[in-house]
Amino acid sequence: MERRQRGFTLLEIMVVIVILGVLASLVVPNLMGNKEKADKQKAVSDIVALESQLDMYKLDNSRYPTTEQGLGALVKKPTTPPEPRNYPQDGYIRRLPQDPWGAEYQLVSPGRHGKIDVFSYGPDGMPDTDDDIGNWNVGNGAHNNGGNGNGNP
């Protein structure tokens, strides 16, 4: 017996390619938007967690770390004044997270937007741009009293 093999015609292959192209043009932008949202949400979660640990630091030591001491004060006891009086042996966190774009989170204490400012420079990595994500614009309102950190605007 003779078997006859039949393949796809060029037209059928072209139709499949066009359909895949149309699907890709619809799906890829949605996926990219979700990645941006997920990155921003991770930054917000990290900032809220860092803020919580900074509050613990303040409870133990009656003040937040200074800008110079930075967020590293949560990992290792600062040796620059003012040195914390009641620092836990293992620190407040094991290591500092990086923001979703591979940069370090920032601390300004006292903050420009509240008692402390904890923030990421955002996707562009540049300071003082519209895409910065900070505790003053994440919606929890815990430290964004709109002033200089002492309750006065």
Swiss-Prot record:
InterPro entries: Bac_GSPG_pilin, N_methyl_site, Pilin-like, T2SS_protein-GspG_C, T4P/T2SS_Core, Type2_sec_GspG. One of its GO terms (cellular component) is plasma membrane. Residues 68-91, 126-153 are annotated as: Disordered. The keyword Transport applies. Keywords: Cell inner membrane, Cell membrane, Membrane, Methylation, Protein transport, Transmembrane, Transmembrane helix, Transport. Pfam families: N_methyl, T2SSG. Its main location: membrane. It is a single-pass membrane protein. The modification N-methylphenylalanine is found at F8. The chain crosses the membrane at residues 8-28. It is found in: Cell inner membrane. Residues 134-143 have a biased composition (Low complexity). Residues 144-153 have a biased composition (Gly residues). GO terms for biological process: protein secretion by the type II secretion system. Residues 1-7 form a propeptide. The keyword Glycoprotein does not apply. Cleaved by the prepilin peptidase. Methylated by prepilin peptidase at the amino group of the N-terminal phenylalanine once the leader sequence is cleaved. NCBIfam families: IV_pilin_GFxxxE (TIGR02532), typeII_sec_gspG (TIGR01710). Type II secretion system is composed of four main components: the outer membrane complex, the inner membrane complex, the cytoplasmic secretion ATPase and the periplasm-spanning pseudopilus. Forms homomultimers. Belongs to the GSP G family. Core component of the type II secretion system required for the energy-dependent secretion of extracellular factors such as proteases and toxins from the periplasm. Pseudopilin (pilin-like) protein that polymerizes to form the pseudopilus. Further polymerization triggers pseudopilus growth. This is Type II secretion system core protein G. It comes from Dickeya chrysanthemi.
